[in-house]
Amino acid sequence: MEHNKVDTEPQDSYDDQQKWVLDSSTDSRGEIPLRAQTGAWRAALFIIGIEFSERLSYFGISTNLVVYLTTILHQDLKMAVKNTNYWSGVTTLMPLLGGFVADAYLGRYGTVLLATTIYLMGLILLTLSWFIPGLKACHEDMCVEPRKAHEIAFFIAIYLISIGTGGHKPSLESFGADQFEDGHPEERKMKMSYFNWWNAGLCAGILTAVTVIVYIEDRIGWGVASIILTIVMATSFFIFRIGKPFYRYRAPSGSPLTPMLQVFVAAIAKRNLPCPSDSSLLHELTNEEYTKGRLLSSSKNLKFLDKAAVIEDRNENTKAEKQSPWRLATVTKVEEVKLLINMIPIWFFTLAFGVCATQSSTLFIKQAIIMDRHITGTSFIVPPASLFSLIALSIIITVTIYEKLLVPLLRRATGNERGISILQRIGVGMVFSLFAMIIAALIEKKRLDYAKEHHMNKTMTLSAIWLAPQFLVLGVADAFTLVGLQEYFYDQVPDSMRSLGIAFYLSVLGAASFVNNLLITVSDHLAEEISGKGWFGKDLNSSRLDRFYWMLAALTAANICCFVIVAMRYTYKTVQPSLAVVADGGDDVETATGTNNTSKFT
């Protein structure tokens, strides 16, 4: 009888794993979620839906922002590009604050609600700036200088949208990923697809923004476009709230900075103690005692920090668990600090890619403005920002081919369930960004030569179709690197910091926007010092964007070499198995397997 009880225990554990979600998440009532009623794609679709509307609004504004600044606010090229980069930089750095608030205090769902409300406030103010008489851009339809009140209202509105995006982006994407349990084999595979399809939905929003919304802004009016964006965001917010019973929630875990500081203090305090060669002698909780995420295995890098987990006196009656966390840390806490330190070089060497990516919404669009955008045989003129749709289409096509064709083939060839490692995917995209800059330099040189041949005649311009290759190739780069960065930072950060993980990925683009401004200023100044003429004039025909693109290509090539070296030395995190159950065939199956802890870049 006892023998039968032992035999059934593994099966009972397996049945519980299939019925319940055992990853410390809760349902809308605060209870352990039922797998069949919560999470997975039934919840993720609501989340992807509101992301569609957020990207619709963001790109409806950002891709046409340089046009707005030069035509409505009458700023010159350099000032318009810099203001666009400043706004983009702030917008993509704000998620660091939003992710911190989500992980530490409000939770991801609560942060999404607050951020979306602020986002809507920005959209409403943007709409009012076009319809309230005192806030309108001009007294008449034609004016040389816009009202100061309109300019102030406009910038307040778009920076409110920045704040909203700061809470929305990291919380929503990580909240969507939380709907898939890492410890469940089927849901873990779904999560790998989730990031690809998240970006497909995101690109659908971008595609609609740069075609429909941009056309409305150019041909009907910015005010009408703002009304549409506000209505779409409000509607999707309402639908997102309807999905509340289907979501899985994670409670905020408090400030992540305190445990990190505790590890450093403990390691310094015990710097003179020997570190045991056997990592099992270091202090760690059991799976049953640890309720906030998963336990991590000890790694061989940054061994100095392991001293924080050294137990000073094993003969003491006081249990190690009751010692001050400022004196004794767990292996998991130590490894979480190591993870964040190891991410710094990866983050830094992806900035060059971010600089290349920022060109698509600034200089690429400005090029399109002065080129022939007529559709052959018709009088229809394509709005310049609509060329950004080529990037969205390229991402959708590339992600689909990668997910449906390349991953199955690569999975069989490499044995990696992702097909290739995350860092390999990022590296491939960086190579495509290099190609995009080379193509952009060649096309811009051709455009300048064409303009000189026709004596800068504004009626004789090169067709904008020549810009298609640089947009398309940059889209392929985004499909590999941006999606890879999302997955990398979400997967490799500590479980309690996953909103911040998404913020780290976005901060690459934010920091790159400021780096781009610095490069514009420095390169323009140096060119003027050397040759007497800068690379950025009042308009494109008096500028030398081709040389700027060549400079970016050279920097990207050097950066790729550095990235490969860092990636080859990178150590992925390893998660301890939390439960072993018996599968149908009788083999042991780990329900929380860790990523291989050796670099898989090569």
Swiss-Prot record:
Its main location: membrane. It comes from the Eukaryota. GO terms for cellular component: membrane. GO terms for molecular function: dipeptide transmembrane transporter activity; tripeptide transmembrane transporter activity. InterPro entries: MFS_trans_sf, NRT1/PTR, POT_fam, PTR2_symporter_CS. It is a multi-pass membrane protein. The chain crosses the membrane at residues 56-73, 87-107, 112-132, 152-172, 197-217, 220-240, 337-357, 381-401, 422-442, 465-485, 500-520, 548-568. This is Protein NRT1/ PTR FAMILY 5.7. It comes from Arabidopsis thaliana (Mouse-ear cress).
